[in-house]
């Protein structure tokens, strides 16, 4: 039957063909599978032991951080930009940011650069001041003006 089959394979030193039966073929398959599993296990163990070498941010020793959905990560801070139809006055914007466990973003150079990258077509509330359209400037505004806003955390 099936186990009685013989296969021609491997050549001996005298260049004569050897005949392999099913059991020797299966043994060779088991050996190859064992070698593959063994090398995978060694690789996994090595990676587990030396994992710290793989997770590094080399620029300024930054640490990895994650932001919630709809937030933008920049310089280890998460920012929420309100969209075009979602403008509020200063007090309402500040309260909304608190509901998101954040505050109105502080006005600094990093945020100014981010607004130029992210969206330079609007004015945003940030910490009781406003980032002007497309300019590298801040301007004081009255608190009741409805504008877009940026939360940070």
Swiss-Prot record:
Q: What is this protein called?
A: Lectin-like protein EP153R
Q: Which residues lie on this side of the membrane: Extracellular?
A: 52-153
Q: Name one GO cellular component term.
A: host cell endoplasmic reticulum membrane
Q: What induces it?
A: Expressed in the early phase of the viral replicative cycle. Expressed in the late phase of the viral replicative cycle.
Q: Give me the glycosylation sites of this protein.
A: 83, 89, 101, 107, 113, 120, 127, 143
Species source reads African swine fever virus (strain Badajoz 1971 Vero-adapted) (Ba71V)
* Disulfide bond positions: 67-78, 97-151
Under the heading Pfam families, the entry gives: UL45
Sorted alphabetically, which InterPro entries does this protein's record hold?
C-type_lectin-like/link_sf, CTDL_fold
- Oligomeric form and interacting partners: Homodimer.
Any GO BP annotation: symbiont-mediated perturbation of host apoptosis
Instruction: Provide the membrane topology annotation.
Output: Single-pass type II membrane protein
- Topological domain (Cytoplasmic) residues are 1-30
Family, similarity comment: Belongs to the asfivirus lectin-like protein family.
Q: Which domain of life is it from?
A: Viruses
> What SUPFAM superfamilies does this protein's entry cite?
C-type lectin-like (SSF56436)
Give the keywords, sorted.
Answer: Disulfide bond, Early protein, Glycoprotein, Host endoplasmic reticulum, Host membrane, Host-virus interaction, Lectin, Membrane, Modulation of host cell apoptosis by virus, Signal-anchor, Transmembrane, Transmembrane helix
Segments passing through the bilayer: 31-51
Q: Where in the cell is it found?
A: Host endoplasmic reticulum membrane
